[in-house]
Amino acid sequence: MKFFLLLFTIGFCWAQYSPNTQQGRTSIVHLFEWRWVDIALECERYLAPKGFGGVQVSPPNENVAIYNPFRPWWERYQPVSYKLCTRSGNEDEFRNMVTRCNNVGVRIYVDAVINHMCGNAVSAGTSSTCGSYFNPGSRDFPAVPYSGWDFNDGKCKTGSGDIENYNDATQVRDCRLTGLLDLALEKDYVRSKIAEYMNHLIDIGVAGFRLDASKHMWPGDIKAILDKLHNLNSNWFPAGSKPFIYQEVIDLGGEPIKSSDYFGNGRVTEFKYGAKLGTVIRKWNGEKMSYLKNWGEGWGFVPSDRALVFVDNHDNQRGHGAGGASILTFWDARLYKMAVGFMLAHPYGFTRVMSSYRWPRQFQNGNDVNDWVGPPNNNGVIKEVTINPDTTCGNDWVCEHRWRQIRNMVIFRNVVDGQPFTNWYDNGSNQVAFGRGNRGFIVFNNDDWSFSLTLQTGLPAGTYCDVISGDKINGNCTGIKIYVSDDGKAHFSISNSAEDPFIAIHAESKL
């Protein structure tokens, strides 16, 4: 009996690393700045049937409404209260979305902004998404309520009160991140208010949280908050399920704060992943795809079972956050599809796909002066995500998750889940291939010359549909067909000028 009890407790201890997705669903998508009503529809009409595991939603709590510049995306990272009331929708719409998505097996993960409230320079008043009064100057947030006692002003030792030196781990945690009022997370009252907010979301039915700015919180303070959280709603989750936790920690090396400091609380965002993969696919600094043979921990990344991975995120696709110029985004569509394809085929980490909106980029001295621009809107009201006849999105919503090449690789990852990384091939340059056991195989040509070779796929004999160039529809293939012989070998030809210079086949794409 002791043995069973031990297993029982271990199961609960490890729960925050598990994404709580339905069996066979292995990726989530960040529907950045989408309205709750559009997410609910997308769960039903697209995400569920296409095998997506869940959605990371933008912060659902009340934030400052900023008009200079006009309604920037980053206003949502400046909380005013924990009321569920934003440009994405109100609490009723949020509840409706969570219910409808869970009912079709698609989970909701909340971007939780709990390190801070709004900036200290914001004017007092009711310029907030729900009309709540707040006064940053006097540290007064009556809608929570928080007062001057609940902030770290007294603990911060820098002259400005802001973080001035990232080599000082204490000020990174106890001072203000770019002027944002830093909550005193060691106080039980503050921890309780945050846990109350997160428990409200858990009770509604969310499956987990991205913890924004985790690097700026002490790991022990995060743990104290997590220890107060409810189990997930048993309408949709097994009894005793814990919320999935992934912490935003930017650790590119060279600073005292390490991702590993946070492993006790949950997974961490591995920012090295997209930065390095972008450098490789762009072939910068002499990097080659052949070097990806030991991708993952071999590149100095966090352990696979602690990693939340992505090619780009809402910050670094516009030059914020971490990764710099190497980050690939939808603006670099051809290379981007290859990078996302590689990520979704490779077993390392838990994968998140980005879904963006277009904005008018304007570079001056190498910087995008429009990096602040918020989502498509009419006078500040977020525009509907319209769906075009060809299944792409309108109204300047990019919907990368609907691109055939990306959607089909989300399915590929589901099909090969649990299979080993096998049958690696490289030409010493930028032509590489690998398999996932006997369930899938993928080939890339990122060289400036064509690729034509017979490779061992590890797959059963038969005719397969390449899910990059087309789809398997009613037993037919709209793209390239690949013939695997009895010995598991197949011939692949990929021109370096192909629209998408990669091919992927899997057990479910067999004709």
From Swiss-Prot:
SMART domains: Aamy, Aamy_C. The keyword Disulfide bond applies. GO terms for cellular component: extracellular exosome; extracellular region; extracellular space. Its EC number is 3.2.1.1. Chloride binds at residues 210, 313, 352. CDD domains: AmyAc_bac_euk_AmyA. Keywords: Calcium, Carbohydrate metabolism, Chloride, Disulfide bond, Glycoprotein, Glycosidase, Hydrolase, Metal-binding, Pyrrolidone carboxylic acid, Secreted, Signal. The modification Pyrrolidone carboxylic acid is found at residue 16. The active site is at residues 212, 248. It is found in: Secreted, Extracellular space. GO terms for molecular function: alpha-amylase activity; calcium ion binding; chloride ion binding. Detected in pancreas (at protein level). Pfam families: Alpha-amylase, Alpha-amylase_C. Residues 1-15 form the signal peptide. Binds 1 Ca(2+) ion per subunit. Binds 1 Cl(-) ion per subunit. Its main location: secreted. The keyword RNA-binding does not apply. The record marks 315 as: Transition state stabilizer. Glycans are attached at residue 476. Changing residue 210 to A/Q: Abolishes chloride binding; strongly reduces activity. Ca(2+) binds at residues 115, 173, 182, 216. Belongs to the glycosyl hydrolase 13 family. This is Pancreatic alpha-amylase. The gene is AMY2A.
